[in-house]
Amino acid sequence: MAAKSQIVTGDYADEYIRFLQLQLGGDRNFCYICVDVKSGMAAVVDPGFRAGWLSAAAAERGLKISCILITHGHSDHVAQAGRLADITGAPVYAGERERVPGSLVLTDGQRLNLGTRPITAFHTPGHSPGHLCYLFENRLMTGDLLFCGKVGGTGPGFPGSAEEEEWASLKRIASLPEETLVYPGHDYYGGDGRMPHSTIGCEKRNNPFLLCGSFEAFTHLKQNWDSYKREHGIR
């Protein structure tokens, strides 16, 4: 079923939940489908440009898309959210400071009930002003705040971004239990599927940005990231 640009890179299921990680092309974008097994209700996180494919993929698995969750308003994450809403009748949710047409606002700490299972939104600004992360059971979908071994961009190329806010947001999610699974918005580890997810503990031990001991060290690393990557063989 999946074309080269539409690949299921993770499919976890137990008696309570199902969780799918999908690579949907674009800039190695990840999309997620969170499922309450009991009700068959599903939430799609960051549909990107693949509304039709996602709708068909859910239908083939007997799932009903009941909500569409947006981490932030950049087009590679949100372009066809409205179309997916039209196809499924599901509402779109995003942060208050994001420009996502037709979306309902989620606030920090707000919970949505997906059948019998909650999804919690965390306001994590930095890469964008209204950026949200979503926690489903022990799975944290971090959008473009935190990647495997890297963090989201800030600066002139990202309007509304703020390094100080990103630093605070990273410190906040780093306080979650170390076994919390991290599912990023892009496959920037290597682009080859070798590490499509991580844990909070792994990132705290290995991510050079989370190893920074101060905001000043964090900004210095950001400013010198290209040379750091060359020195350490990071792609």
Predicted regions and their residues:
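Hydrophobic residues at beta-strand termini and immediately following loops
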Residues: 22, 106, 124, 200
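Histidine-centered catalytic micro-motifs
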Residues: 68-78, 122-130, 183-189
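Active-site HxH/HxHxD metal-binding segment of metal-dependent hydrolases
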Residues: 28, 39-42, 47-120, 205-209
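Conserved beta-strand hairpin/beta-sheet module of binuclear metal-dependent hydrolase folds
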Residues: 7-61, 133-143, 149
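Core dinuclear metal-dependent hydrolase active-site scaffold
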Residues: 33, 111-136, 175
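Metallo-beta-lactamase
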Residues: 129-231
